C-alpha cells in the first residue's frame, strides 16, 4: 500500500469526497503530519473541499513544522499563487492549527 501519506493523498484525490476530507481533517487536527500533508494537497486541488490555497499553505506549514520534508515542495508551489498578505494569513492559520494540536495532545 505504500506509506500512509501517499495512501491518504491518493484516496482523497481519487474520491473527491467531502466526508473523506472531514475524516482526514480530524486526523490532521490530532497532529498526524501525513494527514496534514494530505489535507494541504486536497485544498490545493479542491477535491472534496473548496479550492483554498491559503488553507492548503497553512496545513502544509503545519506538516513542515513537524518535519515533513515532502510538504516543502508543494508549499513552495502554492506560495507562487499567493500574495505576501495571503502567505502571512496562512502562517497565522498554521500557528493556530499547531496550538489546537498541542491542546489535543495534552488531553490524551
Question: Where in this protein do the model-derived segments appear?
Answer:
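Short helix-capping/linker turns of helical repeat alpha-solenoids
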Residues: 2-3, 16, 29-33, 45-47, ...
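Structural signature of tandem alpha-helical TPR/SEL1-like repeats
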Residues: 12-22, 50-58, 85, 89
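Hydrophobic face of amphipathic alpha-helices that form TPR/SEL1-like repeat modules
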Residues: 2-9, 38-45, 76-79
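Intrinsic-disorder/low-complexity detector
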Residues: 20, 24, 65, 73-74, ...
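Alpha-helical protein-protein interaction scaffolds
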Residues: 40, 56-65, 71-78
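Terminal, low-structured helical/coil segments at or just beyond the last alpha-helical repeat
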Residues: 2-5, 15, 27, 77-108
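Alpha-solenoid helical repeat scaffolds
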Residues: 25, 29, 54, 58-61, ...
Amino acid at each position: 500500500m505504500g506509506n500512509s501519506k501517499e495512501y491518504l493523498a491518493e484516496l482523497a484525490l481519487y474520491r473527491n469526497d467531502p466526508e473523506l476530507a472531514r475524516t482526514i481533517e480530524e486526523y490532521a487536527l490530532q497532529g498526524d503530519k501525513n494527514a496534514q500533508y494530505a489535507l494541504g494537497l486536497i485544498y490545493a486541488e479542491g477535491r472534496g473541499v473548496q479550492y483554498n490555497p491559503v488553507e492548503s499553505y497553512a496545513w502544509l506549514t503545519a506538516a513542515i513544522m513537524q518535519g515533513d520534508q515532502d510538504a516543502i515542495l508543494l508549499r513552495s508551489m502554492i506560495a507562487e499563487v499567493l500574495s505576501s498578505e495571503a502567505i502571512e494569513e496562512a502562517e497565522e492559520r498554521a500557528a493556530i492549527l499547531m496550538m489546537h494540536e498541542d491542546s489535543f495532545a495534552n488531553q490524551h
